[in-house]
From Swiss-Prot:
PTM description: Acetylation by CREBBP/CBP, which is induced by peroxidase stress, inhibits transcriptional activity. Deacetylation by SIRT1 is NAD-dependent and stimulates transcriptional activity. Phosphorylation by PKB/AKT1 inhibits transcriptional activity and is responsible for cytoplasmic localization. May be phosphorylated at multiple sites by NLK.
Organism: Homo sapiens
Region (Disordered): 1-100, 176-246
Gene: FOXO4
Lineage: Eukaryota, Metazoa, Chordata, Craniata, Vertebrata
Disease: A chromosomal aberration involving FOXO4 is found in acute leukemias. Translocation t(X;11)(q13;q23) with KMT2A/MLL1. The result is a rogue activator protein.
UniProt-recorded name of the protein: Forkhead box protein O4
Pfam families to which the protein is assigned, alphabetical: Forkhead, FOXO-TAD
Amino acid sequence: MDPGNENSATEAAAIIDLDPDFEPQSRPRSCTWPLPRPEIANQPSEPPEVEPDLGEKVHTEGRSEPILLPSRLPEPAGGPQPGILGAVTGPRKGGSRRNAWGNQSYAELISQAIESAPEKRLTLAQIYEWMVRTVPYFKDKGDSNSSAGWKNSIRHNLSLHSKFIKVHNEATGKSSWWMLNPEGGKSGKAPRRRAASMDSSSKLLRGRSKAPKKKPSVLPAPPEGATPTSPVGHFAKWSGSPCSRNREEADMWTTFRPRSSSNASSVSTRLSPLRPESEVLAEEIPASVSSYAGGVPPTLNEGLELLDGLNLTSSHSLLSRSGLSGFSLQHPGVTGPLHTYSSSLFSPAEGPLSAGEGCFSSSQALEALLTSDTPPPPADVLMTQVDPILSQAPTLLLLGGLPSSSKLATGVGLCPKPLEAPGPSSLVPTLSMIAPPPVMASAPIPKALGTPVLTPPTEAASQDRMPQDLDLDMYMENLECDMDNIISDLMDEGEGLDFNFEPDP
């Protein structure tokens, strides 16, 4: 065996024997870590005294033993062994340096650099220069290749710490000054700055955090004895807005928007352009409809109400109202403007009645309708349009279903059952025309007549005589027609109502 190898092995064994912590220790099988030795726990805590020249460790008992310092250890032939040196040096102490240049942080170094300046302010380039000149670790790291890392760390610390403030430099082309915050500032890092447009601004966050606290004061207290009917009962002033907002969102609106009062910008006063459905229904439905039975259709009830206000006036009042279309009705004894009603109840859908579109009527039927307590069936109240060729005749009311014995005073009778034509205006009665009396031979025929305003006949008038404004003798003088021809034409042509009153050759 080589004597050099034997010497190195002996020296290594001697060095390992110096540390008593590596001796075998007995412990129970249940323990995974050796128990503390009682002789180590009983030793005093005074540090040992070591003479640097002799390299001896002096114990409190007075005896000393020579030790080998790490600096005086002979190196083995194979070079230093890391395991042996680590065993000699032992674990690192708790007071070791935090960074490569020492225990000071970047912020502390920057603070020292700024405080060392005469004006207590430095530019970024001056801070770099102070670091390279003062701190030994950065002396050989001033070039551009090796300074990128620590210079970037300095810029981050200047921006993120509130103890440093940036002051504008008045000199042209110079960077800003960095100074210590006179208010002290926090030593820790400030939160990273965000863009002003982001939702995480501190002002909005403070407002959101305070909003729940203001909720009891914003909400109006309900009156005593009142019970809330809906979850949005407290927000009655939101008349135009939907009720889908929850209570918290509504509170946010009332908290952040108290100043806006215009209809364009304020949610609390915005009104819907649509009228409430209850108001529209209240205006469209007449008050008298509710007095009829529920089984009667509303349209028939409206027609009966119109019949209640029929006024039969003289013929001179017809010409003054020639511009009206439809029926102008006014209740007897009631003053005020006349209410104009469309003829959609009684006439087909072609349009309202105009001057010259006529029907036939009898005073008995009118009186029966006006004095009847029960509404007649819809088949008894019918209406039709007559071809415009009859523009010289006034507007007349056709009542179907009358008994065949009821004759008009002038000789015009109504058929019990009207005939149906294929067209929409299909109800045309069979008329038996009788020559008018000679007294009315010279009566002029008006060219255009307005819609008559009908009034009930007076008590003195005869029940069997037609009113003067409805007398057909004054309008139908020398009028000859073949009703068979008319009915056949109506049946053939359908909607095209073409009346021909010329006599056949």
